């Protein structure tokens, strides 16, 4: 199968590791390289694409600023170093993107933010709003509060979760190697690059090494794990070298890389997950006008809801039924059951007056809604 082209994609997540971003000897950001990457991002941005960045580097920058000795850090030392480094990292990205007239928004996430549905929806909504405002979200694991037991441990898998959360159609992992090889290229002269992976088989997994460095916790094995997460959610992924200047331009020009392809797309994969995987926690019964609106691709507004049943929290899956009780679809609800009961039948502008807060305009956003027959 032929490799796709970078400009075929509209919603792109770019992951940048510590070993690329930070000069390990000097403990400083590789300013020239980052400026070149920012220029690449700006070019995609000018083309109307949504670009999100998952950036490592907070711990590495923090330990440099604090003049900590080389070697492994204890958990509390890593957390404290990250607290210092996160400020430096945010400032750095703001400056390099600002040079192109692009705003940067920092988002610090934890493992729970992508696994617990209420927090998942909050993070997803924040990313969506930044993209709507044509800013570039810069995302990192919140190493200041993450624990050894509950964390991603590497930003490859975090990037895959972010790509899934944001319904990205492409995840780019910039690495110190230009793709997946049949064997470790540093020690095997017969190793060859695999340009396209259509399915992640046991053989493909066996090709993944465990290489890493003091600054970068990830190796090829974690990249394969990231590819599993991304492709199962309908997101294509590629691994390419970030050691060169203008790495995204190199990809666009057909440079060496490995593509991990998926036959699905993010929207269908996400809606399949909502319709067939999540257990519904309640039911919303809607009027005939709302039924017509949903079938026309609209979101479900509070005004169209006539009955609320069940005990559910924001982010839970619920069944949507028409006035004849037939199932219309399923979706992730933006309000818990108590608040949904209060605002049912009311127009969206009334929500603030009723709840005392500025809530979502939609009871279920169309991106979180599957309209059709009940799954079998």
UniProtKB/Swiss-Prot annotation:
Q: Which GO terms describe its biological process?
A: L-proline biosynthetic process
Query: Which EC main class describes this enzyme?
Result: transferase
In which pathway is this protein known to take part? Amino-acid biosynthesis; L-proline biosynthesis; L-glutamate 5-semialdehyde from L-glutamate: step 1/2
Which SMART domains does the record match to this protein?
PUA (SM00359)
User: What reaction does this enzyme carry out catalytically?
Assistant: L-glutamate + ATP = L-glutamyl 5-phosphate + ADP
Task: Give this protein's Gene Ontology molecular function annotations.
Answer: ATP binding; glutamate 5-kinase activity; RNA binding
Q: Does the keyword Nucleus apply?
A: no
Source organism superkingdom: Bacteria
Q: Which CDD domains does its entry note?
A: AAK_G5K_ProB, PUA_G5K
| Residues where substrate binds | 56, 143, 155
Q: What is its EC number?
A: 2.7.2.11
The family this protein is said to belong to: Belongs to the glutamate 5-kinase family.
Q: Which HAMAP family match?
A: ProB
Q: What does this protein do?
A: Catalyzes the transfer of a phosphate group to glutamate to form L-glutamate 5-phosphate.
Read off the PANTHER family from this record: GLUTAMATE 5-KINASE, ISOPENTENYL PHOSPHATE KINASE
Query: Under which name does UniProt file this protein?
Result: Glutamate 5-kinase
Q: Which gene encodes it?
A: proB
């Amino acid at each position: 199968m032929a490799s796709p082209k970078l400009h075929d994609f509209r919603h792109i997540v770019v992951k940048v590791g510590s070993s690329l971003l930070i000069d390990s000897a000097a403990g400083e950001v590789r300013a020239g390289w980052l400026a070149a990457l920012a220029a690449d991002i700006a070019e995609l941005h000018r083309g109307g694409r949504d670009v999100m960045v998952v950036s490592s580097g907070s711990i590495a920058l923090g330990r440099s600023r604090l003049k900590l000795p080389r070697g492994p850090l204890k958990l509390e030392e890593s957390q404290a170093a990250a607290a210092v480094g996160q400020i430096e990292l945010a400032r750095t990205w703001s400056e390099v993107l600002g040079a192109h007239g692009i705003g940067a928004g920092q988002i610090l996430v934890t493992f729970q933010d992508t696994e617990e549905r209420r927090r998942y929806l909050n993070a997803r909504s924040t990313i969506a709003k930044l993209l709507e405002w044509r800013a570039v979200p810069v995302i990192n694991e919140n190493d200041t509060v993450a624990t050894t037991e509950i964390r991603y441990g590497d930003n490859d898998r975090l990037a895959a979760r972010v790509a899934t959360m944001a319904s990205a159609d492409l995840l780019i992992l910039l690495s110190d190697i230009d793709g997946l090889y049949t064997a470790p290229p540093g020690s095997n002269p017969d190793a060859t690059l695999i340009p396209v992976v259509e399915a992640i088989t046991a053989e493909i997994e066996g090709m993944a090494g465990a290489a890493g460095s003091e600054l970068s916790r990830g190796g090829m094995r974690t990249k394969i794990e990231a590819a599993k997460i991304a492709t199962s959610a309908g997101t294509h992924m590629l691994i390419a070298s970030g050691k060169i200047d203008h790495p995204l331009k190199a990809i666009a020009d057909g440079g060496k890389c490995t593509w991990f392809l998926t036959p699905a797309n993010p929207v269908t994969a996400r809606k399949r997950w909502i319709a067939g995987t999540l257990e519904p926690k309640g039911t919303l019964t809607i009027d005939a006008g709302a039924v017509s609106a949903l079938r026309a691709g609209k979101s479900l507004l509070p005004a169209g809801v006539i009955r609320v049943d069940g005990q559910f929290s924001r982010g839970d899956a619920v069944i949507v039924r028409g006035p004849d009780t037939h199932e219309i679809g399923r979706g992730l609800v933006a309000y818990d059951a108590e608040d949904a009961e209060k605002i049912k039948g009311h127009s969206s502008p009334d929500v603030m007056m009723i709840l005392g807060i500025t809530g979502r305009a939609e009871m279920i956003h169309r991106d979180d809604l599957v309209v059709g027959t009940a799954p079998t």
